[in-house]
Swiss-Prot record:
InterPro entries: OPT, YSL-like. The gene is YSL13. The chain crosses the membrane at residues 80-100, 103-123, 148-168, 190-210, 252-272, 310-330, 355-375, 423-443, 455-475, 487-507, 541-561, 603-623, 640-660, 675-695. It is a multi-pass membrane protein. This is Probable metal-nicotianamine transporter YSL13.
Length: 724
């Protein structure tokens, strides 16, 4: 079987993989982030190797042997969903802010797991003191909370608020002249967004349910994120793990408070967009004009502490290459390569080079890894089928596992409980058919440009793509969600045509495909987590459904709060540039109109960077010993459009973590993710009161702005004339 580098090795010095890149560009690669403290998981192994490794490892289930496993109904408690509801709100705000600023979303599983454990422990402790505790807090219930929370806040990403939904708006369409008409514009509105998400977000939950036993037990797919989450939860429910978790929560709380009040303090100095600490020319005014400055953002310092070092360095190198070298050189061609009269934000001018060269890097990287994943999946499936001497892919049934290989106590116990609570086949197939039928009839009422027969084709093809993505995720922790979405943009946009609203149809089809492929892989990750914590597949499925329903309401409401409170969302250079929105719409325009709209020599540069992305990835795979020193093309592409200020924040975060690891690696690995999560959460939650103040028309009282000495002299002279 083909070997795949371990995602967790990125910090340690081996080949960084898609797990690294997921935290690089959320619009391209999204996985259920694994806790940074558990980096021991790797690619899928063959059955014998996995069994031998587990047999040699200390038994986890013997530690919990004296604790009864609650029934699947007992795992679904009211307190679990109450805690999940509030955590979904909290993390949806954080993810939405990240989505609308840079699109870089790190793993938040550590904070989700910690806070879920902490709040339910508080709940049970309070009830126990008054003698009303009826059911102890179990790891199965903890798994239900984790699943519900991640399913809920994942809609804040996969719902397309930072990419395909915002791409449909008049605000983003106004950045260019192509497809800037009523047929290709649909402005966001709370009602249709919630309806659209309910129609497309559930169907992926039913597609792969019949294959859960095959992929988890028979093929022994690792699902590194799901495995790491299970290790985290199992650890919480041991005496030593509970003490460590309490200390981690304390660290998270301290930095949450500091980060929140730092955001509050900064707000007083931001009377306009160009004021405040986030516009501090820390590297000089000349560097500031080229987007090089430290903006005092706890969020992206925290992101830098969570992302692997190679990711942070790649982002910084991309910023230096683009804003430090390429854009100043291309700007000198103004009047030759593009009209000197065009504004800086025009896609026919300077902005066109920034956006389309970034797209070329992203597509080159995505296409290479898509083909690589298909090849790895094919080889792995062929190997598995040969071992079982079977010509067809088996489907989950109600029988027990039969195997001639010796299994450990843990594996036997987990297999027994995993096949005990079956999800009936008619629920899976019937659910898929019913939801698909409703969606086929209703989505065209919301997006008339996307016809019913196009949605039918998408739903016929989607299970195959969902299987490929879920299998690849199980092997490598690599979810190519928006690669499939971008393919849908091209395919359905070209099918519809420019004269029939092809841009809008392509973007809507992207949303349909992304939601199906994403939720299918996410559910399989949850099944793996449940398998390792003895949580019932039924409780996992129900929790995922409830979490998705929460997300379909909460995420649009959070987005609407941002959209109404801040009128500069999607505008380049603003606090919320939403870079992926412009990128997705530009991809849709390319799919419909071709390359005729590109400025001079832009296409040649795109070809060069597309090829460079493939070559760099090829070198990374062919020379794994030095791949940790080779930057990731997709990571480099992110600052091409929005600038390098966040890259400096992230680099500072990675330096902090690197020094901490040198001084005391054990503490850095244990508490680093909690500290980073506190910084991200505190700064993220500050957006809520900031939004309320903006809606109430309460403006900051002070503008802190930085001027050159010459400009300052002119301002002083002007103010002097006013005083006379």
């Amino acid at each position: 079987m083909a070997t795949v580098p371990t995602p967790s090795e990125a910090h340690g010095g081996a080949t960084p993989t898609a797990a690294d890149v997921e935290m690089v560009e959320a619009s391209e690669l999204r996985r259920r982030g694994k806790p940074s403290g558990d980096r021991a998981t790797g690619p899928s192994r063959d059955g014998a190797a996995a069994a031998a490794e587990e047999a040699a490892a200390p038994s986890v289930e013997r530690v919990f042997a004296d604790r009864p496993v609650p029934s699947w109904r007992e795992q679904l408690t009211v307190r679990a969903f109450v805690v999940s509801f509030f955590l979904v709100i909290m993390f949806s705000v954080i993810v939405m802010k990240l989505n609308l600023t840079t699109g870089i979303i790190p793993s938040l599983n550590v904070s989700a797991g910690l806070l879920g454990f902490f709040f339910v422990r508080l709940w049970t402790a309070a009830i126990e003191r008054v003698g009303l505790l009826r059911q102890p807090f179990t790891r199965q219930e903890n798994t239900v909370i984790q699943t519900c929370v991640v399913a809920g806040y994942d809609i804040a990403f996969s719902g397309g608020f930072g990419n395909y939904i915002l791409s449909m708006s008049e605000r983003i369409a106004g950045l260019g002249t192509e497809a800037n008409n009523a047929q290709n514009i649909k402005n966001p509105h709370l009602g249709w967004i919630i309806g659209f998400l309910f129609l497309v977000s559930f169907i992926g939950l039913f597609g792969l349910v019949p294959l859960r036993k095959v992929m988890i037990i028979d093929y022994k797919l690792t699902y590194p994120s799901g495995t790491a989450t299970a290790f985290l939860i199992n650890g919480f429910h041991t005496p030593h793990g509970a003490k460590i978790a309490a200390k981690q929560v304390k660290k998270l709380g301290i930095f949450f408070i500091l980060s929140f009040f730092w955001g509050f303090f900064q707000w007083f100095y931001t009377a306009t967009d160009d004021c405040g600490f986030h516009k501090f020319p820390s590297l000089g005014l000349q560097a500031f004009q080229h987007k090089f400055f430290f903006d005092f953002s706890p969020t992206y310092v925290g992101v830098g502490m969570i992302c692997p070092h190679i990711v942070n360095v790649s982002v910084l190198l991309g910023g230096i290459l683009s804003w430090g070298i390429m854009w100043p050189l291309i700007a000198k061609k103004r009047g030759d390569w593009f009209s000197a009269d065009l504004p800086d934000g025009s896609l026919h001018g300077m902005q066109g080079y920034r956006v389309f060269i970034a797209i070329a890097l992203i597509l080159g990287d995505g296409l290479y890894n898509f083909l690589k994943m298909i090849i790895l999946t094919a080889f792995s499936l062929r190997s598995q089928i040969k071992k079982k001497n079977a010509s067809t892919l088996p489907v989950s049934d109600d029988g027990m596992v039969t195997t001639t290989a010796a299994v450990s106590y843990d594996e036997e116990r987990r297999n027994e409980l995993f096949v005990k609570d079956q999800i009936p086949w008619y629920v899976a197939y019937g659910g898929y058919a019913v939801v698909a039928a409703i969606s086929i009839g209703t989505v065209p009422q919301i997006i008339p440009q996307l016809k019913w027969y196009q949605i039918l084709v998408a739903y016929i093809v989607a299970p195959i793509l969902a299987f490929c993505n879920a299998y690849g995720t199980g092997l490598t922790d690599w979810s190519l969600v928006t690669t499939y979405g971008k393919l849908a943009i091209f395919a359905f946009g070209a099918w519809t045509g420019a004269s029939h609203g092809g841009v809008l149809a392509g973007l809507a089809a992207c949303g349909v495909m992304m939601n199906i492929v994403s939720t299918a892989a996410d559910l399989m990750q949850d099944f793996k987590t449940g398998y390792l914590t003895l949580a019932s597949p039924r409780s996992m499925f129900v929790s995922q459904v409830i979490g998705t329903a929460m997300g379909c309401v909460i995420a649009p409401c959070v987005f609407w709060l941002f959209y109404k409170a801040f009128d500069n969302i999607g505008i380049s250079g603003s606090d919320y540039p939403a870079p992926n929105a412009a990128v997705f719409r530009s991809i849709a325009i390319l799919g419909v109109d071709g390359f005729s709209s590109l400025p001079k020599n832009c296409l040649n540069l795109c070809y060069a960077f597309f090829a460079a992305a493939i070559v760099v990835n090829l070198i990374r795979d062919l020379v794994p010993k030095v791949s940790r020193f080779i930057p990731i093309p997709m990571a480099m592409a992110i600052p091409f459009y929005i600038g390098s200020y966040f890259a400096i924040d992230m680099f500072i975060g990675t330096v902090i973590l690197f020094v901490w690891q040198r001084v005391d690696r054990a503490k850095a690995d244990t508490y680093g993710p909690a500290v980073a999560s506190g910084m991200i959460c505190g700064d993220g939650i500050w957006v809520l009161p900031q939004s309320v103040l903006a809606l109430a028309k309460v403006k900051p009282p002070i503008c802190m702005k930085f001027l050159s000495r010459r400009t300052n002299d002119k301002v002083d002279a002007f103010l002097t004339t006013l005083g006379k």
